[in-house]
Amino acid sequence: MVVTNSDPSDFTPLEDFFDVILTDVPCSGEGMFRKDPVAISEWSPENVEICRQRQRRIIADIWPCLKPGGILIYSTCTYNTKENEENIRWIRDEFGAEVLPLDVAEEWNITGNLLQGESFSVYRFLPHKTQGEGFFLAVLRKPGMSVRNSGDKQLISLAIAPETPGLRAEKSREKGRKVQGKGKQTPGLSKEQLAILQKWIFTADKYEFIQKGGNVSAFPKCYLPELSALQSALRIVQAGLEIAGQKGKDWVPCHALAVSGILVSDAFP
């Protein structure tokens, strides 16, 4: 997992990088009216139009990052067709995307396309028909075929071609680190410190231990090229699983480690 704090336009250089992109785009919030009076007071036709244009900018900025054949999941918490069906139609027509149908059980009471003259598959959750607040969802596929490593069964495929962003970023690794840490590097862990932390997680040899400030995170080594590519373009808030914080001369395990699947519980008798 990598957490970033960046504008969508910052992702644009990461060409053909992601297999799947989930965009829960900012919207006019009509689906929140029942539980949030503030959402009602903020609504206006002008705000709907502002949201629609913002949503399109986000999609246009991140579309190059999606691999050919990749999946875009578009969602909002609003009802109107301007921010929903009209935007899905725009993505289809502007970028040649294929709108995908989903196998949805009839008893879910999902409402389909409300745009006159269109029949592509969308999924609208209305609170008087479904459990929960208002919600909209559509799934699209980018045209083309992605070059994948048949032996890689991970959702996010590794860099496998000379011109992939991950390998290109190797040349700009130092630049990427400056983006993340504003040019200031933290000291590395000593062998003694590393030996302590390695006992806390399973298959520790598969992880890179990254120290940032007084905390240490474990990041899968197999995705270091991808991390380097992200560092070259984005502001990284957190990379990997935060496993320990330093308190005086001691290391204190973090909550994230306790609820992870890689904790060696016997390390804490």
Predicted regions: what is each one?
Residues 46, 85-107:
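Conserved Class I S-adenosyl-L-methionine
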Residues 20, 121-147, 152-153:
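Core SAM-dependent methyltransferase catalytic element
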Residues 66-68:
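Helix-to-beta-strand junctions that scaffold the AdoMet/dcAdoMet cofactor pocket
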